[in-house]
Amino acid sequence: RRQRQMCIRDRYAQTMAERGFLTIAFDPSFTGESGGTPRYMASPDINTEDFQAAVDFLSVQENVDTERIGIIGICGWGGLALNVAALDTRIKATVASTMYDMSRVNANGYFDGEDSADARYAKKESMNAQRLVDYKNGSYALGGGVVDPLPEDAPFFVADYHDYYKTDRGYHKRSLNSNGGWNVIGCMSFMNQPILQYSNEIRSAALIMHGEKAHSCYFSRDAYAAMVKDNPYADNKELLIIPDAVHTDLYDGGGKDAIPFDKLEQFFSENMR
């Protein structure tokens, strides 16, 4: 069995702290070590506020320079980090790592395979029916975490997730992906909330990085293109594609040091001066 690794947020926070940055790591509201009920719900509004609340907290610490604050968002919270960057002018530099566009994947399905009004309507019907069931039961049905055992015909990206969340690399007893998953209706609100709508108005520095072989790489490529389109502040934006890396390699390095921490140190040092 693999040696147990730090969780995703701590891997980034600890390494950046070792490189001289003051860091704070947090789980999104309603998940993991964070409080709030109902559990296992996502919210474009509240999860954006999570980042802003962290900035609030850092800004009143005596050892923090309020003109030198940056954020890192990973996976679904990579896309949310870009949303925060478009909203919070206190943030001077943003990194979105192995990002998902949560609005897009919830509305259109993986690889835009459900991108039609009829497909979206069918999903809405199903989830609204589930809302009523949940209300009557007084509890939320879970959607299920990463499948285990892994079927032989599982898609590549499911196998990638299994290799992280169901092994010592990333398993945690309070990780929703390692266990019961999000609530069935947990991400429903993203369908109607385009979190990257104003990404091309981001003035501060932004680095989007993704694994070349990640199933999700299209989110980063398209998010970068949208962010720099007609943006007069495009010069401080960058897309970095990591050769041979898959999605979860940027969670913990994938055993091959896939996370470019030298680049992150350089990016934040140059853009938070």
Region spans (language model):
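Short, small-residue-biased leader/transition segments that mark boundaries at the very start
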Residues: 3-8
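Alpha/beta-hydrolase-fold enzymes
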Residues: 82-166
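Short beta-strand/loop motif that positions the catalytic acidic residue
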Residues: 202, 208-210
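Conserved alpha/beta-hydrolase
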Residues: 13-35
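Catalytic histidine neighborhood in serine/cysteine hydrolases
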Residues: 228-248
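Alpha/beta-hydrolase fold nucleophile elbow
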Residues: 62-76
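Alpha/beta-hydrolase active-site loop
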Residues: 41-62
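Catalytic histidine-centered segment of alpha/beta-hydrolase-like enzymes
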Residues: 245-257
